[in-house]
């Protein structure tokens, strides 16, 4: 894989194909000595790279990232995806890996000077990143880890990060710590794939626990959430 850390080239995206629509843009930032963060912003976009001459079998991607729609940390309107060939997983939203106030360690697993407070009414639940620097610390601590897996049958694997676009100004998909692993054939990969599935189950439970309140006015930001 070429430039998995997004540190090469004049714009840091050397080796990657980038497609931007509807005003989308790409950039990098963060705390370099902690973790470089790349991101796509606004509109719809696709950042991808195709690997060839690979051994056939099961491959897994691990990447830290989140999707923030319209600059709203409470939004569950998700258009961000991490993908491998025709398999994709939606990026976590801010609320899926809140660091609790009691567990927050400044400049270790969060950046209190930059992070936003996540509240339930007046009650502080914890903190979520909303800047490049905040993502560097959160991701380096293992927060917002996403997985995707697929089977390669022709020696070719395309990996990528994309947003389908929400039509809302301020969409943001920051990511880093990208790794791609070869897990072997289907039988050999079972144990590692179980970890991926466990991650999906944990995410599903988190989403179930985050039903929007009846008083929330931004219903367009949560089009798929119902408390029925």
What are these regions (language model features)?
Residues 65-135:
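Extracellular ligand-binding interfaces
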Residues 133-138, 160-171:
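Short beta-strand-plus-loop segments that form exposed binding edges in beta-rich domains
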Residues 168-190:
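Exposed low-complexity, polar/acidic, P/S/T/G-rich flexible segments that act as propeptides
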Residues 187-228:
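Amphipathic, heptad-repeat alpha-helical segments
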Residues 16, 39-42, 55, 66-83, ...:
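Extended, low-complexity, turn-rich repeat/linker tracts enriched in Gly/Pro/Ser/Thr and Asp/Glu
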Residues 35-38, 47-52, 133-137, 145-149:
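Beta-strand-rich interaction surfaces with strong enrichment in secreted/lumenal proteins
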Residues 6, 45-76, 147-151, 157-159, ...:
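Extra-cytoplasmic beta-strand recognition segments
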Residues 2-41:
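Extracellular glycan-recognition surfaces and repeat-rich motifs
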